[in-house]
């Protein structure tokens, strides 16, 4: 029998993702400023698409960096 680990998402099911919410978006970005995959963060397909669009929009508006220089 196979047991799957239940993933804990940082989002509630009905919570919307906004590009202005930088603290929330930073939870889904690695140290190298890459977007974390859906497998790792436990989001649904719809939430992952919204997240990717919001992160990309925030990068274009210079709210998030494209690459961390640390």
Curated annotation (Swiss-Prot):
The lineage of its organism: Eukaryota, Rhodophyta, Florideophyceae, Rhodymeniophycidae, Gracilariales. It comes from Gracilaria tenuistipitata var. liui (Red alga). Gene3D superfamilies: Ribosomal protein S18. GO terms for cellular component: chloroplast; ribonucleoprotein complex; ribosome. Keywords: Chloroplast, Plastid, Ribonucleoprotein, Ribosomal protein, RNA-binding, rRNA-binding. Part of the 30S ribosomal subunit. One of its GO terms (biological process) is translation. Disulfide bonds: none annotated. One of its GO terms (molecular function) is structural constituent of ribosome. This is Small ribosomal subunit protein bS18c. Its main location: plastid. It is found in: Plastid, Chloroplast. The keyword RNA-binding applies. Belongs to the bacterial ribosomal protein bS18 family.
């Amino acid at each position: 029998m196979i047991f799957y680990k239940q993933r804990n998402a940082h989002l509630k099911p009905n919570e919307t993702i906004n590009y202005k919410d930088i603290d929330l978006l930073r939870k889904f970005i690695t140290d190298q400023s890459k977007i974390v995959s859906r497998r790792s963060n436990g989001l649904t397909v719809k939430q992952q698409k919204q997240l990717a669009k919001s992160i990309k929009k925030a990068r274009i508006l210079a709210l998030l960096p494209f690459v961390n220089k640390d």
